[in-house]
């Protein structure tokens, strides 16, 4: 529960088991009810941030991490919670939270890039979210990095997310492990693929493991180039970075920073402030609430 100043009054978390729409709606409903009970204040509306393409009000077109297509999540949640629901892309929500009460305070033009399980970005231009004609603008994770390349959860091939998103970094690390191609990865995860994380991949690359270095370097290069190109196109006042992968993989983050310095347009990066997201995991929920 968030007030109009962006302060969290109460919070509740619930572990997500089954990922079908009804199960997710019920999980969110239980967590929301607990947060409302803890806050003890009236709530006018509900904001929901989802890692999904949301081309129309309340409808998810594609949610790669959940395997969803064409799900009216907004209407389902409104029926469950009995309150108006605004459904927005998770990075749009995070960008709005950072703009209002985080690292973007006082700025009018932001580029927000998060790398976690996937790759996402959001754009604030002249103080407003830039979402495009179909509501799916700023989908950095789904620009084509390697046309015809690795399969992405969105159903297409060669997306940036398929190379640099956390889930896909782990998938590539597991492929190396299965082929016996990375002794360092095998040692770091005790030969258990289920234990692999992007941090293991970066550590193996740091140790000089050839195949881990190849995968990590490709991800870093593609991500850095994509962010640098966005800086050139958008000329933001601030670039805000966040997400678990960038937070816990400093080598990847450093490559992004170097890429912006080396490859973005000189005039576009003049005066650019590069900042870490201030609100951490709360940026999306605060932003979604403030947008509701």
Regions found by a protein language model. Give the residues of each.
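Gly/Thr-rich phosphate-binding beta-strand-loop-beta motif of the actin/hexokinase/Hsp70
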Residues: 1-10, 111-127
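ATP-binding/phosphotransfer module of carbohydrate and carboxylate kinases, centering on a glycine-rich
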Residues: 1-45, 54-57, 75-85, 100-107, ...
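Short hydrophobic alpha-helix segments
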Residues: 12-14, 64, 133
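A short acidic/small-residue loop/turn micro-motif
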Residues: 15-18, 68, 137-139
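A charged helix-plus-loop insertion that forms the helical arch/lid used to bind
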Residues: 60-69
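Generic enzyme active-site microenvironment
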Residues: 88, 96
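Active-site glycine-centered loops adjacent to acidic/histidine catalytic or metal-binding residues
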Residues: 90, 116, 288
């Amino acid at each position: 529960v968030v007030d109009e100043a962006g302060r969290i009054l109460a919070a509740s978390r619930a572990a997500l088991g089954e990922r079908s729409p009804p199960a997710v709606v019920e999980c969110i409903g239980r967590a929301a009810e607990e947060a409302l009970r803890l806050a003890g204040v009236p709530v006018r509306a509900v904001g929901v941030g989802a890692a999904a393409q949301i081309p129309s009000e309340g409808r998810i077109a594609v949610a790669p991490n959940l395997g969803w297509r064409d799900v009216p999540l907004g209407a389902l949640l409104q029926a469950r919670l009995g309150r108006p629901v605004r459904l927005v892309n998770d990075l749009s929500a995070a960008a709005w939270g950072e703009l209002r009460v985080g690292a973007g305070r006082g700025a009018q033009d932001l580029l927000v890039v998060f790398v976690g399980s996937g790759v996402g970005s959001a754009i604030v231009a002249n103080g407003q979210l830039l979402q495009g004609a179909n509501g799916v603008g700023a989908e950095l994770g789904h620009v084509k990095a390697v046309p015809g390349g690795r399969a992405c959860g969105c159903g297409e091939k060669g997306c940036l997310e398929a190379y640099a998103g956390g889930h896909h970094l782990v998938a590539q690390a597991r492929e190396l492990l299965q082929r016996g191609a990375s002794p360092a990865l095998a040692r770091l995860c005790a030969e258990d693929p289920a234990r692999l994380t992007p941090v293991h991949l970066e550590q193996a690359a740091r140790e000089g493991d050839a195949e881990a270095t190849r995968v990590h370097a490709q991800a870093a290069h593609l991500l850095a180039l994509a962010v640098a190109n966005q800086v050139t196109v958008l000329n933001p006042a601030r670039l805000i970075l966040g997400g678990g992968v960038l937070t816990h993989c400093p080598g990847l983050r450093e490559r992004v920073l170097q890429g912006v310095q080396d490859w973005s347009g000189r005039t576009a990066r003049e005066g650019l402030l590069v900042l870490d997201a201030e609100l951490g995991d709360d940026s999306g929920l605060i932003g979604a609430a403030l947008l509701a």
